[in-house]
Amino acid sequence: LRHFGPTMAHEIVMLGTGNAFLPNGRHHSFAIFDGKHIIDAPPTALISLRENGIKVSEISTIFITHLHGDHIFGLPFLLLERTYISDRELSQPLTIVAAPGARKRIEELCEIAYPGSMKKILSTIVWNEKAQGSTKDGWNWNRFEVNHNEFVDPFGYSFESTDGAKFVHSGDSGPCEPLYS
């Protein structure tokens, strides 16, 4: 991922465009923007990042759209890799942005996957459950409800950079008003 000159050229890379069933061998739905912010962490996240030459330690923000397995079951592997391979000192800050209540479920998922192995990294993560905020590099974001299974707290995100770049990620939404406004 590259940034050019004094004005940054933003880049969004779709690291996966499949659904829960991986049609035609496509990786699960997964995106990265500006080389350091990922949207969701599916089971195929680690391989998608490696295939694209992206180091797990360079990820600074993980935005979670909802709590279905095809969107979060890669989190234990990403955090484990970061702990034991790419950021052993846990010196690179990591923020996870998710709906209220998601932290508890994500921590439970990590404990089930690797009991006791991720307590340290989980304690260093900055958890953000607010409906809006900003990244350190100038992306303002807003989380909004979308049309999907209510039991998994489904949300989309709108993003706007301080230089005016904008995009929306809908998660697994069907048509709904927030996507058009």
Each predicted region: which residue ranges?
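Acidic/polar short surface loop at catalytic or gating sites that assists cofactor/ion binding
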Residues: 87-125
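Active-site metal-binding motif and surrounding structural segment of the metallo-beta-lactamase
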Residues: 46-95
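Short Pro/Gly-enriched beta-strand edge/turn motifs at strand-loop
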Residues: 9-17, 110-112, 137-142
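Active-site metal-binding loops of divalent metal-dependent hydrolases
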Residues: 17-19, 36, 67, 101, ...
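Metal-dependent phosphodiesterase/nuclease catalytic metal-binding core
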Residues: 32, 125-181
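Conserved beta-strand hairpin/beta-sheet module of binuclear metal-dependent hydrolase folds
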Residues: 8-52, 153-171
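Structured loop/turn residues at beta-strand edges in well-structured enzyme cores
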Residues: 54-57, 92, 120-123, 137-139, ...
